[in-house]
């Protein structure tokens, strides 16, 4: 049976829409920070958090005890918290005799354990009786109520196996997940495993089907996969068949698909990203998408259901399950209690025996006794919780006087309040931070400089740049700027001796320009030796047998790596560098190739391929070929002449042999006109036109307000990290560069900005760069705090005399930054900076970067809290504790607001992703984060699992956001502050739909500080509210809405 095309397309559309709540997961080597609830950003923040709890079984707010700890530490605005409670109470019915505001504020601040969900069996009359010390009123619970409770765990779309696990303890879900994970590991492996799934080029579903049909282990278990796969040879057809066999109504297919995909949302997110990443090498070789993945999951799930039905008599479809529950609700209820972990401990043994006996009469006798006991316990516990709360609020007597109807209203009200309390705490903590930051911004016009600075330094907006910028500025004549770390130049980079492109830009952008790295000098012998040794190392380290075969293969060198990088990383690194010297000096190819140059390159490549083909196919060595023979073969393969007569005659090839060889040149070696056109098109992507070069330099300078007063040195500082034995290393690199180092983008812009032709064009546009200004690329290692200059051999001779001063200043800032930062990493502050030894702290930072045993080489972007867009003068006098993204911006250089819109649409969106990833990883590290690094194992060279088999861990590890099991990262939504006239900033925000929606839906906080009016404007409750700039923290209640 083959499904009709229209039906197949409908199923594909359903699957892709069902997968939209699942965030993309990029390979670990280019880790991209992302919002775990990115697919729900169209919803208000609170609604998305609630849906995330249902889909991913994860919490979206910190527990109350942690919030109370923040309150005790003075990190919560108590006034705002009380106002949140008052607003909630204004919409609630009154409860006679109770001061609800005081009661609920006491619940928040003085009761550590939440009251939890209301009782399921005990009602208000039962609780009232306990409060009065009376016996519970006699009451029989109807079977319909029990069936309803069971039905609440069986919503439409929930997979049948999940219901069976709950009612019968089958653990089908865990078994299914294990089989699916193993299948994914086999198919998606990128060279880690010794064995890869055969036939992967056919795609995930076809390759897996071929293996599954022959899988003896599955057949012996009774999983007759082959019978299911025989129904249809397409994944869409199999999906339709399985859903029909399960009896799932078509209206519920979407919810069912979403439940299936979110079960292992890490794997689903990786497949979802991979299927759309057309440039990704492994996607092109071995295609896969969510339809393939879902079909495999449904096939295995149906096979497991049938296996359990045959062996244990469990229902095999939804209709059978419904009949089972309806025919014996008592058994269904007790099964749910026992297998769902709700059973009363004192009656657990009796319930287990009754379920195992499978005799309706026995469960019917046990049920009334169980229900009565549970009703009594629920009533007593709830009464005790209410009494404890009321007494702490000074309302114990008032609680005793409540009638049953009042108790019912109070219970429902408390449940609604606890559902919303996370939002209230978050708003109060965010108000506290906003109240600390906004009034401290300096809006005074800056004094004109007496002289130009010694150096101007552009850093990435990354929060880790804030510390080193501050220390560099304190040293003296340095002016710093913040700009997105790709410097506004999206490039696709082909590094030295690399064969693939790396996108160095935010993932929301797609680069169209390719940059090549070329070596200046090279020693052929050294290159051959080093590349061979490096290949040996790569193969050995990649092998699962490496701990055993390395000593036999190349002595103790690899073993020394393990010990040296753990016990003496600095000394060992210096010794190791003598074996692995730095790569040769390089230049970047930035100018467009002419058509003649491109065609010449293609001709050279074709000639080289022809020589290779002749040697491989015909066994003819190069020295026997003349240039004319090679030309003949090339022209024949391209169809420019009929045959290569001279070549055929020289080597005595008959007509068939000659024709066959020429066809091989076309088909195997791709020497044909069509492929030549494709190569010409690809070569056309290399470099930038002069107009593009002028545009990128001008845009970068205008976006940060640097259009005049250029100093002798302008440093473009990209950043990245270095750490050993760290799968999350790319998470510490530059997010604006796609999880890569930013030095290449810095070199690109510096090389362009130093061109005379580019400067001449910029001068026509009003940007006059001084004749003695030189742009120098630099690299900020965020793990060691080192600042390193690049391409110094290009410096004009006139600048050489100043380089020592420049390097010394950068080194001093690095040491001071390390002294500050290392205190946050050590258990005791004195460990990092004993006796003010900043050099010692710097050495410790370098040691951490080289230590294989170091699980936290740096904190990364933890504790990020705000994104400030404005002049450095507004924040220059503040110690922002490495918590703020700083993007330089001068509205006076941007009369139409286009530059501000670009900052909002690009860098701010990336910052919001970073912020949300840290937020959710800190709030619930077990589900949104990735747990402890200690238990991580690499999966297929592209991801991380916990233990040997798990879902792909998609968030940040505990060591990045937690310290001593408590959040080190304070989870706050990103506070975005724009320093500009309010109308100017508001127009820009409204002009960027993505940011406007994030603001309206509460995914970030937005504020504008107007330097002309000295007012602050904060977007709250769907509108802008005006505050005096220097009194934001005191103006919570005195709000003026701006229409």
From Swiss-Prot:
Its main location: membrane. It is found in: Cell inner membrane. Zn(2+) binds at residues 460, 462, 719, 734. Pfam families: DabA. Keywords: Cell inner membrane, Cell membrane, Membrane, Metal-binding, Transport, Zinc. It is a peripheral membrane protein. Belongs to the inorganic carbon transporter (TC 9.A.2) DabA family. This is Probable inorganic carbon transporter subunit DabA. The lineage of its organism: Bacteria, Pseudomonadati, Pseudomonadota, Betaproteobacteria, Nitrosomonadales. The gene is dabA.
């Amino acid at each position: 049976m083959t499904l009709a095309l229209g039906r197949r397309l409908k199923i594909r559309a359903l699957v892709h829409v069902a997968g939209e709540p699942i965030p993309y997961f990029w390979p670990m080597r280019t880790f991209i920070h992302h919002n775990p609830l990115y697919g729900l950003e169209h919803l208000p923040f609170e609604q998305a958090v609630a849906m995330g709890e249902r889909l991913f079984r994860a919490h979206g707010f910190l527990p109350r005890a942690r919030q109370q700890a923040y309150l005790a530490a003075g990190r919560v605005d108590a006034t705002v918290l009380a106002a949140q409670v008052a607003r909630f109470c204004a919409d609630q019915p009154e409860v006679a005799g109770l001061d609800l505001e005081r009661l609920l504020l006491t619940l928040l601040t003085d009761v550590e354990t939440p009251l939890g969900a209301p009782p399921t069996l005990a009602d208000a009359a039962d609780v009232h009786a306990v409060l009065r010390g009376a016996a519970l009123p006699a009451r029989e619970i109807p079977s319909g109520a029990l069936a309803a409770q069971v039905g609440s765990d069986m919503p439409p779309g929930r997979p049948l196996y999940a219901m069976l696990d709950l009612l019968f303890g089958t653990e089908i879900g865990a078994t299914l997940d294990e089989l699916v994970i193993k299948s994914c590991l086999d198919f998606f492996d990128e060279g880690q495993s010794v064995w890869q799934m055969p036939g992967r080029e056919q795609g995930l579903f076809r390759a897996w089907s071929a293996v599954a049909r022959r899988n003896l282990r599955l057949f012996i278990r009774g999983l007759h996969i082959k019978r299911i796969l025989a129904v249809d040879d397409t994944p869409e057809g199999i999906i339709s068949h399985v859903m029909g066999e399960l009896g799932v109504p078509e209206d519920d297919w979407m919810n069912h698909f979403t439940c299936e995909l979110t079960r292992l949302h890490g794997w689903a997110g990786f497949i979802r990203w991979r299927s759309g990443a057309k440039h990704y090498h492994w996607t092109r070789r071995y295609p896969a998408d969510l339809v393939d993945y879902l079909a495999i999951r449904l096939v295995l799930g149906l096979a497991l259901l049938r296996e359990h039905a045959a062996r244990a008599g469990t229902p095999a479809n939804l209709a059978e399950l419904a009949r089972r529950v309806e025919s014996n609700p008592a058994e269904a209820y007790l099964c749910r209690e026992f297998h769902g972990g709700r059973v009363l401990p004192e009656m657990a043994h009796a319930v287990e025996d009754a379920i195992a006996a499978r005799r309706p009469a026995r469960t019917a006798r046990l049920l009334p006794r169980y229900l009565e006991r549970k009703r009594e316990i629920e009533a007593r516990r709830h009464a005790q919780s209410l009494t404890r709360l009321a007494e702490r609020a000074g309302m114990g007597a008032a609680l005793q006087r409540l009638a049953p109807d009042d108790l019912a209203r109070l219970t429902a009200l408390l449940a609604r309040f606890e559902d919303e309390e996370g939002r209230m705490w978050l708003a109060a903590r965010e108000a506290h931070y906003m109240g600390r930051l906004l009034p401290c911004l300096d809006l005074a016009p800056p004094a004109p400089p007496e002289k130009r600075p010694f150096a101007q330094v552009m850093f990435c907006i990354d929060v880790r740049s804030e510390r080193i910028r501050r220390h560099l500025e304190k040293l003296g004549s340095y002016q710093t700027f913040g700009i997105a770390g790709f410097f506004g130049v999206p490039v696709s980079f082909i590094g030295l001796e690399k064969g693939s492109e790396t996108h160095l830009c935010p993932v929301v952008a797609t680069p169209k320009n390719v940059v090549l790295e070329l070596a200046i000098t090279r020693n052929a012998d050294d290159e051959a030796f080093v590349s061979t040794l490096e290949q040996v190392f790569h193969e050995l380290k990649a092998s699962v047998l490496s701990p055993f075969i390395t000593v036999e293969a190349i002595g103790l060198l690899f073993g020394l790596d393990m010990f040296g990088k753990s016990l003496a990383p600095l000394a060992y690194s210096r010794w190791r560098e003598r074996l692995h010297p730095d790569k040769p000096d390089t230049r970047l190819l930035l100018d467009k190739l002419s058509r003649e140059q491109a065609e010449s390159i293609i001709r050279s490549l074709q000639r080289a391929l022809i020589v290779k083909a002749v040697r491989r196919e015909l066994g003819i060595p190069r020295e026997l070929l003349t240039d004319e023979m090679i030309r003949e073969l090339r022209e024949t393969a391209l169809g420019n002449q009929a045959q290569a007569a001279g070549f055929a005659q020289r080597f005595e090839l008959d007509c068939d042999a000659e024709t066959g060889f020429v066809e091989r040149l076309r088909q195997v070696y791709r020497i044909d006109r069509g492929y030549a056109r494709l190569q010409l098109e690809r070569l056309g992507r290399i470099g930038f036109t002069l107009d593009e070069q002028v545009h990128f330099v001008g845009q970068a300078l205008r976006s940060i307000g640097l259009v005049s007063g250029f100093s002798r040195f302008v440093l473009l500082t990209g950043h990245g990290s270095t750490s050993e034995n760290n799968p999350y290393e790319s998470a510490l690199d530059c997010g604006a560069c796609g999880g890569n180092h930013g030095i290449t983008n810095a070199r690109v812009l510096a090389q362009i900005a130093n061109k005379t032709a580019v400067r001449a064009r910029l001068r026509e546009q009003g940007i006059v760069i001084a004749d003695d200004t030189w742009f120098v690329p630099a690299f900020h290692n965020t793990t060691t705090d080192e600042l390193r200059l690049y391409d110094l051999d290009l410096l004009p001779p006139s600048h050489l005399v100043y380089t020592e001063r420049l390097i010394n200043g950068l080194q001093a800032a690095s040491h001071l930054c390390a002294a500050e930062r290392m205190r946050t990493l050590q258990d005791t502050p004195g460990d990092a900076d004993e006796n003010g030894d900043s050099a010692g702290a710097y050495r410790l930072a370098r040691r951490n970067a080289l230590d294989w045993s170091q699980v936290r080489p740096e904190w990364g972007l933890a504790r990020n809290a705000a994104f400030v867009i404005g002049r450095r003068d507004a924040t220059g006098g503040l110690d922002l504790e490495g918590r703020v993204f700083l993007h330089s911006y001068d509205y006076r250089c941007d009369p139409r607001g286009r530059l501000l819109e670009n900052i909002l649409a690009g860098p701010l969106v990336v910052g919001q992703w970073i912020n949300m990833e840290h937020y959710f990883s800190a709030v619930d590290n077990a589900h949104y984060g990735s747990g402890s690094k200690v238990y991580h194992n690499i999966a297929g060279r592209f991801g991380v699992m916990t233990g040997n088999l798990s879902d792909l861990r998609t968030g940040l590890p505990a060591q990045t956001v937690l310290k001593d099991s408590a959040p080190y990262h304070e989870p706050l939504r990103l506070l975005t502050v724009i320093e500009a006239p309010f109308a100017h900033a508001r127009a820009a925000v409204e002009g960027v739909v993505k940011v406007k929606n994030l603001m309206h839906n509460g995914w970030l906080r937005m504020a504008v500080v107007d330097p002309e009016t000295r007012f602050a404007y904060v977007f709250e409750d769907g509108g802008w509210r005006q505050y005096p700039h220097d009194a934001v923290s005191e103006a919570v209640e005195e709000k003026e809405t701006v229409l």
